[in-house]
C-alpha cells in the first residue's frame, strides 16, 4: 500500500510540474519555462561531456570577445608559450583548423545544437515523468557528443603530426605501457594531469596485479570493482561509455587512453553561450531544442600523449 501510494504521488507530482511548465509557455511566460529547462540541461551537460571534465569551461562576457580582422566571426586571442604550437577545436560554423606558432593563438567559436523535439501541448500534460528531465536527456546527448567528437578529433590530429613521439603503442594494458606514456610527456617537460579512456578499457585495470597497483588497491578492486576507483597510479581517470568517439571503432585498429597535462598547460574552454533551451509555439504544437556556442583551444600541442592498445 505504501509503495503504491508513493508511485501515485510521484506521477501526480510530475504531471503537475508538466502542466505548470506547459502553461508558462502558453501564457506567454516562455522565458521562465526556458530558464527552468536550461538549468536542467546545463547541469547534465557538465556530467555528460568528457571534454568539460578535462578542460573546465569559462563563460566569457561580451567585452572579452575579440573581433576577427577579416570576418565577423567571434574569437578570443590567448597568450601562449613562444616555443609551443597551438590550435583550436573547429566546431560547426567556426573557422578551419589553424596551427599557431607565434606568441598568441586564436580560439574561434562555433555552435552545437540538439535535435528538435516537437509535441502537442495537451499530450505533454499527460507525461508521467518530468518533461524538463526528458528535454535535458534528449538535448544533452546530442550536444555532449558534438563537443567530445570535435575535441577528440582535434587531439588525434595533433598526435598524427608526431606519431613517433606522441603515440605509445602497447601490446597489452599494463603499468609499463602507461609508464612509457607518462615518461614521454615528462621528457617533453609537460606535467601529467588526467587520463581519458573508455569504461571498457578501464575495466582492464581489474587484471592489474597487486605488484603493479598495490595490495590495498587490488583488494579494493576485488571488493568494490573498478567503478569505486577514481585514479590509476595517482592520476585522475575520466572514463566514458563513448567508445565510438574515443576508440577507432570503424577500422577496429586501436583502443586508446589519452594522457593530458593539467588545464593550465593544455588549453582553454570558453563559452560565448552555455547550453540554452529554446521553445517555440505554433498553435498547440510546441518545439524545443537547445544550443550553445563553445570554443576550445589547445594552447600546447605537446601536452597530450595517446597510448594505443590492440582492438578487443
Predicted segments, located by residue:
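Generic detection of short hydrophobic beta-strand segments and adjacent strand-loop junctions
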Residues: 67, 115-117, 307
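Residues in well-ordered beta-strands of folded domains
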Residues: 106-108, 116-118, 196, 238, ...
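Assembly/oligomerization interface modules of large self-assembling protein complexes
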Residues: 39-113
Amino acid at each position: 500500500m505504501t509503495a503504491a501510494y508513493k508511485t501515485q504521488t510521484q506521477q501526480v507530482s510530475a504531471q503537475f510540474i508538466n502542466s505548470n511548465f506547459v502553461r508558462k509557455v502558453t501564457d506567454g511566460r516562455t522565458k521562465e519555462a526556458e530558464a527552468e529547462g536550461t538549468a536542467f540541461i546545463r547541469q547534465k551537460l557538465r556530467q555528460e561531456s568528457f571534454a568539460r571534465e578535462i578542460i573546465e569551461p569559462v563563460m566569457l562576457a561580451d567585452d572579452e570577445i575579440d573581433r576577427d580582422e577579416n570576418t565577423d566571426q567571434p574569437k578570443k586571442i590567448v597568450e601562449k608559450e613562444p616555443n609551443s604550437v597551438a590550435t583550436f577545436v573547429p566546431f560547426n560554423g567556426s573557422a578551419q583548423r589553424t596551427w599557431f606558432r607565434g606568441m598568441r593563438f586564436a580560439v574561434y567559436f562555433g555552435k552545437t545544437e540538439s535535435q528538435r523535439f516537437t509535441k502537442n501541448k495537451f499530450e505533454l500534460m499527460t507525461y508521467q515523468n518530468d518533461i524538463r528531465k526528458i528535454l535535458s536527456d534528449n538535448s544533452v546527448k546530442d550536444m555532449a557528443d558534438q563537443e567530445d567528437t570535435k575535441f577528440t578529433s582535434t587531439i588525434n590530429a595533433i598526435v598524427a603530426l608526431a606519431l613517433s613521439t606522441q603515440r605509445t603503442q602497447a601490446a597489452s594494458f599494463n603499468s609499463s605501457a602507461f609508464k612509457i606514456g607518462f615518461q614521454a610527456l615528462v621528457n617533453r617537460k609537460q606535467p601529467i594531469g588526467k587520463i581519458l579512456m573508455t569504461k571498457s578499457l578501464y575495466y582492464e585495470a581489474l587484471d592489474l596485479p597487486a605488484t603493479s597497483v598495490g595490495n590495498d588497491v587490488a583488494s579494493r578492486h576485488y571488493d568494490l570493482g573498478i567503478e569505486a576507483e577514481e585514479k590509476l597510479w595517482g592520476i585522475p581517470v575520466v572514463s566514458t561509455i563513448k567508445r565510438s568517439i574515443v576508440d577507432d571503432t570503424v577500422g577496429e585498429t586501436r583502443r586508446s587512453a589519452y594522457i593530458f597535462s593539467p588545464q593550465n598547460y593544455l588549453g582553454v574552454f570558453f563559452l560565448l553561450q552555455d547550453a540554452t533551451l529554446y521553445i517555440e509555439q505554433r498553435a498547440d504544437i510546441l518545439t524545443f531544442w537547445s544550443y550553445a556556442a563553445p570554443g576550445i583551444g589547445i594552447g600546447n600541442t605537446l601536452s597530450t600523449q595517446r597510448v594505443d592498445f590492440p582492438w578487443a
